[in-house]
Amino acid sequence: MGSIEVRNPLLSKKLKRTETRLLIIYDNQIRYNQIRDLLTSSDHQVHATLLDDLQNFEKQLHLPWDVVIFGRAYDLKYEQALTLIRNSNQVNLPLILLKPDEYQSTQYASFIRKGVYDILDLEEADNFYLGLLRALSLSRLLQSQQQLMN
């Protein structure tokens, strides 16, 4: 019998060829660098912006983004970020929450119901990367759908 190669379309080169636009909300430059390095080491073209406050987040929402990654911020909570996204022209922009220190797995459903796309742990690099690719694929699909409707 012949063998069948099964390939996950999330890992295709098409996602890597287009620029990935990340808005990273974190008060730590090291985490920002980790995320960028993880993607660039997998041959992604990355345009990322790091910020940690409400005012800059509001300004940046006027620009096109693929995914928001939320860690910790000076004066911004993830709930505020979700509300601002819903009220922007990018209502379907996925927000990934970096696993909070006090996070319990029993809270997962509550975060998802509030509008968080997923909760990922940057310390688990492979899982983080695959979760980010899922969010990126959804974002690109929704962007294409929106362009067709306009």
Predicted regions and their residues:
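Receiver (REC) domain switch/output surface
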Residues: E124-L142
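Non-catalytic signal-transmission and effector/linker regions of two-component phosphorelay proteins
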Residues: M1-T40, R140-N150
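Short hydrophobic/Thr-rich beta-strand motif most characteristic of the beta2 strand and flanking loop
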Residues: H44-D53
